[in-house]
Amino acid sequence: MLLNSSEYLNTVESIKQEIRAAQYRASVSVNRELLLLYHTIGNTINAHKTRGSKFIESLSADIKLAFPDASGYSVRNLKYMAKFALAYPDEEFVQQPVAQIPWGHNTVLLDKLSSPEERLWYAEKVIENGWSRNVLIHQIEGGLYQRQAIASKITNFEARLPASQSELALQTMKDPYLFDFIPLKENMLERDIEQALVKDVTKLLLELGTGFAFLGNQYHLNVGGDDFYIDLLFYNLSLRCYVVIELKTGEFKPEYAGQLNFYLSAVDGLLKKEQDHPSIGLLLCKSKNDLVAEYSLKDMSKPIGVSAYRITSCLPEEFEKQLPSVEDLQKRIL
């Protein structure tokens, strides 16, 4: 048998996948045991809380003395353990997503969130997207839960997509989108901001969410000899469909939906393969009247969502006139 035969290569790949799966299960198991230990220690600390801070300081010193090679038993971390045990009083927390994410991620959830529902939602997103601790902090500070999980979204997805596809598309969508990755500084020139956009294009993909593959800006379509240009074209691997994004500098207008509906028909006709799901459109406007947007989408034949966008969460007035227009922005993304 040849060692480079397809059968052999498939066998090797299968074994590699089994090894990776076992490594993942082992890491999850170790993490779960560590969190159980921290939970137990936290409960013990809480049971002696009347002894005051000196108790934790003494406990930290004695643990380090008994286990000099062990880390994680500083006074600060012991206080986190106590907080962790209070946040999850039942040991059944090991069945929840928080038991599958690293301790450092859990301390972020404890520091920044008070709602159990939000903590659970962000823990699920960490598992789903493989976020680092810093990315988790960024998403919490950007209000992702409010913009994605509980925002009232203007779409016709339910009427134009199968139920499973519609639900996933809604989960993917945000309102508003936050383009806060432009590092604003005093006396910045327009070209400085443009260069920052080019440098940080990967952060645009982070804001859009998992599964987005960038295919181009000002993407050219030839329809019957006429030329058309899509602002931003993506393929979403989770939705298994093309996603057409149109950017508008002002308030939403009904004619924008008609233009995007045409682009989606063209993409479905020219690019979509048999295995692809129907293409989805997203209009990003500086502002929108929700009722006008709802009526505009009601009789559109293609699945479209309308969201607002913000350049920053808190834009200093002196920078407002220096920002490039959305048309300039989309030309310089790549």
Predicted regions and their residues:
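Basic, low-complexity intrinsically disordered segments
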Residues: M1-L334
